[in-house]
Amino acid sequence: MALIVHLKTVSELRGKGDRIAKVTFRGQSFYSRVLENCEGVADFDETFRWPVASSIDRNEVLEIQIFNYSKVFSNKLIGTFCMVLQKVVEENRVEVTDTLMDDSNAIIKTSLSMEVRYQATDGTVGPWDDGDFLGDESLQEEKDSQETDGLLPGSRPSTRISGEKSFRRAGRSVFSAMKLGKTRSHKEEPQRQDEPAVLEMEDLDHLAIQLGDGLDPDSVSLASVTALTSNVSNKRSKPDIKMEPSAGRPMDYQVSITVIEARQLVGLNMDPVVCVEVGDDKKYTSMKESTNCPYYNEYFVFDFHVSPDVMFDKIIKISVIHSKNLLRSGTLVGSFKMDVGTVYSQPEHQFHHKWAILSDPDDISAGLKGYVKCDVAVVGKGDNIKTPHKANETDEDDIEGNLLLPEGVPPERQWARFYVKIYRAEGLPRMNTSLMANVKKAFIGENKDLVDPYVQVFFAGQKGKTSVQKSSYEPLWNEQVVFTDLFPPLCKRMKVQIRDSDKVNDVAIGTHFIDLRKISNDGDKGFLPTLGPAWVNMYGSTRNYTLLDEHQDLNEGLGEGVSFRARLMLGLAVEILDTSNPELTSSTEVQVEQATPVSESCTGRMEEFFLFGAFLEASMIDRKNGDKPITFEVTIGNYGNEVDGMSRPLRPRPRKEPGDEEEVDLIQNSSDDEGDEAGDLASVSSTPPMRPQITDRNYFHLPYLERKPCIYIKSWWPDQRRRLYNANIMDHIADKLEEGLNDVQEMIKTEKSYPERRLRGVLEELSCGCHRFLSLSDKDQGRSSRTRLDRERLKSCMRELESMGQQAKSLRAQVKRHTVRDKLRLCQNFLQKLRFLADEPQHSIPDVFIWMMSNNKRIAYARVPSKDLLFSIVEEELGKDCAKVKTLFLKLPGKRGFGSAGWTVQAKLELYLWLGLSKQRKDFLCGLPCGFEEVKAAQGLGLHSFPPISLVYTKKQAFQLRAHMYQARSLFAADSSGLSDPFARVFFINQSQCTEVLNETLCPTWDQMLVFDNLELYGEAHELRDDPPIIVIEIYDQDSMGKADFMGRTFAKPLVKMADEAYCPPRFPPQLEYYQIYRGSATAGDLLAAFELLQIGPSGKADLPPINGPVDMDRGPIMPVPVGIRPVLSKYRVEVLFWGLRDLKRVNLAQVDRPRVDIECAGKGVQSSLIHNYKKNPNFNTLVKWFEVDLPENELLHPPLNIRVVDCRAFGRYTLVGSHAVSSLRRFIYRPPDRSAPNWNTTVRLLRGCHRLRNGGPSSRPTGEVVVSMEPEEPVKKLETMVKLDATSDAVVKVDVAEDEKERKKKKKKGPSEEPEEEEPDESMLDWWSKYFASIDTMKEQLRQHETSGTDLEEKEEMESAEGLKGPMKSKEKSRAAKEEKKKKNQSPGPGQGSEAPEKKKAKIDELKVYPKELESEFDSFEDWLHTFNLLRGKTGDDEDGSTEEERIVGRFKGSLCVYKVPLPEDVSREAGYDPTYGMFQGIPSNDPINVLVRIYVVRATDLHPADINGKADPYIAIKLGKTDIRDKENYISKQLNPVFGKSFDIEASFPMESMLTVAVYDWDLVGTDDLIGETKIDLENRFYSKHRATCGIAQTYSIHGYNIWRDPMKPSQILTRLCKEGKVDGPHFGPHGRVRVANRVFTGPSEIEDENGQRKPTDEHVALSALRHWEDIPRVGCRLVPEHVETRPLLNPDKPGIEQGRLELWVDMFPMDMPAPGTPLDISPRKPKKYELRVIVWNTDEVVLEDDDFFTGEKSSDIFVRGWLKGQQEDKQDTDVHYHSLTGEGNFNWRYLFPFDYLAAEEKIVMSKKESMFSWDETEYKIPARLTLQIWDADHFSADDFLGAIELDLNRFPRGAKTAKQCTMEMATGEVDVPLVSIFKQKRVKGWWPLLARNENDEFELTGKVEAELHLLTAEEAEKNPVGLARNEPDPLEKPNRPDTSFIWFLNPLKSARYFLWHTYRWLLLKFLLLFLLLLLFALFLYSLPGYLAKKILGA
């Protein structure tokens, strides 16, 4: 369907001007070309076409706007014409002439004339035929090019372009609407895509520069909108074909986990152990007793050698277990799990210092179970991880802000059920031998299906399986497997596997992975994971059953499946659980339930699909398969599989469904004449067998010639094409984007001009493509078979692409020359997102397999995704390989394809494929090369629509191929010498030719043209021009014995010249280009070549361009590369500095004694002088030699330079020692400065002896001085201070070093209320470690600032790119905002904190520089003038050998190169002191041997790889330099992975003989040899001679005493004088008042220094030091000098190449022995912990919960005692006595604890040593946080004591105690109230009330008591002077507490207890009872005596 608008003319225009038209329909606009100088009438005559996906509604509107075009200002609207399309929809074609309307809707005179046509596919609109349909798409070339590319530079015939036109058109091209994936019909004249698109931009730039007054053209407003949408580089000539399967190859991985601590563990009085599990490996921490917040700091390493897929699916599980011991497995407190892939996808592949949330898998309603703080890192081979510095780490108290969760995952995760519904499977293969089946059949007559399938599902470390369906190829389950896990889960994939149940061993039939990210969306408008019901296809090994299947791994999902195995209908749903629901099952056990069956039609209506293929060429067939006939089989699912299909699917009868009538076929008359009965069309799925013919010694080909065999297959699948169509549209956008980005990268790499314009074009195309997707993707909305995922995914994709289109549009406006690289990075993100979205998780049609078969055996295969072959009439929906000739390289299946076996091409096919509905079959031949006749299987009436079984080509074209093979570089070393004898073999069609063999080189220059004559290509000529066949180039190593060795392969496409084209620029002659050579999946060099395919016209070869090149008579028939293609050469001089050779290994067991170096480049070269005795002095006598050579003008084409070292032996023999190829001379090229440029001497960096220095020429000195004042700042900023100055200006750099006195005066002025921590540290208390820890704080602060600025910048970029987008905030941004808010809250001190916790001021301590990496990486390997070249010998190893280049290194050549054009400018040689013998290497030192004192300081090691079974190591240092070998075995550190060594070693060495220092860390073993953990190597010689002065670091300040004493034997003034002398710099001139002038720079600084006695004396050292610290600002010779530092070096183990085994912190000082001797080494021995004693008096408790019920009275009471410890419960637990029977919760103790401990103040850790177990050889040192634990318990006599509550006080920062029990609240401990924090190390004595907490049943904290305690800290000396007794003992005893009498034991004094128990409680009741008793007694007596008295009374007695 399409709407076509033909805009003819616009008339009645006023005035004269440039006009442009804009035509808009459905939001997509096209612009016409600009018509210049139109007066009255504008004759556009342009056609615009909109392919439309859905029918046009009669109410839709077409809008046309006419503008006056302005090249500078915005365009001015003339008028608008809007047309409702009602009539167009009814009549198909409408011609219109009408007037326009202006802005105010008034009619104006101007009128337009146009024609509108509408093509509807269903034929409902007017009469039309196929001609209409095709013809309109292929209008004549000019119109079509105007429509799509009319405004794109380079897209029009160059004859029509003038400079002015080019300028206007290019400026306007931003608005050109590129239609995505537009391919022209083959009938039209093709557009010249290869023409360089930049050629026509020159006029634009010229004009822009005039406009902008010499500004950069891209800063001018018009130029800044210029966009290029056609390729500039020739990337298309380099097809990217990967031969070797990369998936499934095992790799080395290391998972390292540090468990630091746990907090808030739920439970009372726990003994927690942390279990760390990766896959099936488990490791445990030590047990911590009776604590809810244990501290571990234990490091675990897990090593794996598996494929990436297996690795990333492994689950990391961190569990906390309570009371685990040898007998008990312990009870699980909680666990946390995450897959390895989630960790690997994090920045730096790690989580650092994050808190894992624990939850109980057995009780999902239980909530949070605690937190574990840990570091998790996953390292693959070669990964470089930046680990944050380990030392002096502070506690991250903000748990919520540092959770172990990926970005965007909410901290509150909910429990959810994952329902995996398994419905049924189809097409299962036979999984049993048929022998028994045949016996059964013979006896019983049964023929059973030979498979017993069931489905197993793996998710998040759990697995569940369905029931087994016995003997069924089409099993029906209708079951669901239910998993319960937290949502969102931290496991990315779910594995679904069909398995065959077997008595012995169940085997996998097929595996499918469900990526949860692809079936859900976590955005604001996202959706929960959902899938299906949908079919998923499973692939694996071939279907023939064998008992031992060598490809069984493929069925397990490892590697690419080579055959269709089965398809499974499944569904997935997620339900978030309400954990408060009491009916909910709380277990997370996997359950299997019955699922509701679904109807067959729910996955879509079954449709008949038709697959057609034509084999146009089969070449490069491996010679192993050349002796038997070969056939090719094509299968789709089980259809077409004739050999082992076995359970062939039955053809389903088409079912009529309601709505079928509406789905009229897209092309009405496509297959009317085909019958519908079964069997009307038998499938032909394989080609007839044919015996191959020989091509050359390696390969064969099948002689198809003009008869091309065809295959066709009918198959039936649910019609879910819409899914594939949408995926294809996105793939097209992504392909276009990738091509564009590659083009931009190539432009940047090859330094082509204006990459920013090309990037704008790329973004423009992306924006249009996204818009196109929105209009096309929303079809077929009402289909009943659409699943929920289909609907949600579509919405999600539409939102993403709409957003991406808008971002691309806004990003396009921001692309400038200086931002190209940044924006390119953002565009790469777009590409990743598009590829992710295009991957459809719900399969429909299975992939197509092409198998090469010989003798009925499957040999090699290729797999093509069905979506790539799917036909659609909408261009964007068409599969990228549908109806196209595709080149396929067949490969061996499974593991056979790994390694050298996979390097050989098994076969190369040129194959045409088409897949579509049978109804659309009319189009299946439309893309084939024209000129064929069809051969049918049967002849007769009504069979004309039958597909052909072969095609006979009658049209063929004659061509000649010229392969210009110039040179190759960095080839694979195939011989044991480390060199090769390479030749290249070029394959094209069925021919091959070889270049000559060049001996012993890795960089051959063949300079040879290979001519392939008599090439016959079938098809239309112009089709071959657009898409020529692929050329294969293979590089081999010629062996005198045996066959040639394969070295690598590359692919190319030739530039095609048709007979009617002129052989002239810009397309011809072709340019030489580099092609990447691959050997398997590894790169193996580059080939510099060009290829052209020339059509031979009617007059034969006479029309071809002549072969003219430099004829070399010596080369005989070999033709060189012709002039015009070969590079233009210029004369260059190559100067070589020969310094020396190092570490040469033996050759053939003989030592190298008299080596020589040969240098060769482009056939010319030079030899070094001979080293007469390598052992005595390995340096050369003659330092500099040179030779002249002709090199290409284009630096990218420079040939490599070869360095070879030979050993000269007796009788004139010499043997090769090793060689090195410098593949790029670029870094050694010297460019004379352009003195005409302003500020040339600051902007140009010169190469002096290959050391780039600023060149300072004669310069006029300005009169004014620039004063740069360097005020003292925060230490953080101090390190960053740089003074950037112009080299010609004078400057005063004022450096004020803060003087002690000023500081002291300031301190004195401070009031007494100031906090003690702000005091100036006492100089005598400071040591080197103070300096070290202060420096680490600074480094961390800098890193934090750097990260913050980095994230701010990224956010800013994201904001910019998303500018103008109105939409909800993404969840990622929300979570980030929440985290920031939380951080702010935590950082801001509360009102109550006041002076207690202000922002900690830094003490004034001098610092050094801590480098988190090697010093070499900071200073360019110290190769400022002396370079090191590794000499290699031996064959290059392959990946699977695990070999590295290290093993091939046989020595090193030290020297340098300088390459420059001759002649040099005279002023260079005229410079002062120029010595012609040294050429460009002026001022280099002598290379005579020199004696040096090397002093190595080893500070500490971190994260060492465990070497012992217990997961620890006993490390010690070993140092080797020359013959000196030091092993510090005695001082090994027991059971430590983070040892602090603090050692220095002095070694006397002689350079150059002893220059490679090796520092290793070994593991001490009691028995057996010690194991190497890792080592690092340092080249001392490069450091010694470097201009960066790496001998002894320059300190920050100059001191003559104290901890910061100056280490260098030379003072700063002496160093400065020497540097000035060596660099021939004027100075230093010291002046009064602390001034020094060096060259034209003046530095100022303090002029006095204080000695040890406090005496001040004048000095120039401070100011000299300030000059040294800014030496890089000195003109011409300035460079950064190495500061005083500590470097961090990775430790590597040769047995585990590429994986770090830990890191070592050290630094090296070197002092020449002929200079003054240095002072004593610095003392960096580890700080000894200081001995302290903590005295804790427990006075009272209050409000303690009452646990016991009284036996007699039922009254609540508690028998209270208090327990406390500091180091650990086993080590120093102390209990008070028991306060019995407390009725009020009050307890009185007056009890003293004494805790002696050793404390490291710098690390805030207690140090303790103890044996790890009874079997340990020695004590292990532990560092634990200084935390005092106080607990209250209820004592029980017979049962275990009951735990009531606890508080843990961090002695460095704990809440100040409340003055009274009433003021003491629970919030003090939970941190909800701002309480002043105190440190016992500062306060020394603290007394107060503290709350004691425990968790209740709801897992919430509750107050269980209060304790009054007094803490008193004393040093060991003070404690000795004032001793006190433990408990209430002497000396200084505490008085006994005055406890109430209730607090005794009742059975010792029952009367007393009765008195207390009864009288105190019930006295009033007792009194009432007594009174009542007396009254009753009285009444009883009265009654008793009443009768007597009455009788007496009556009787009167």
Swiss-Prot record:
List of residues binding Ca(2+) 2: D975, D1037, D1039, D1045
Keyword Kinase belongs to the record: no
Membrane disposition: Single-pass type II membrane protein
A Pfam entry, by short name: dsrm_Ferlin
Coiled-coil annotated spans: 791-820
List of residues binding Ca(2+) 3: D1508, D1514, D1563, D1565
Residue numbers on the Cytoplasmic membrane side: 1-1963
Domain of life: Eukaryota
Function text: Key calcium ion sensor involved in the Ca(2+)-triggered synaptic vesicle-plasma membrane fusion and in the control of neurotransmitter release at these output synapses. Interacts in a calcium-dependent manner to the presynaptic SNARE proteins at ribbon synapses of cochlear inner hair cells (IHCs) to trigger exocytosis of neurotransmitter. Also essential to synaptic exocytosis in immature outer hair cells (OHCs). May also play a role within the recycling of endosomes.
Domain-level remarks: The N-terminal first 124 residues can be classified as C2 domain, based on their 3D-structure. They are not sufficient for calcium ion or phospholipid binding.
Name of the protein: Otoferlin
Gene name of the record: Otof
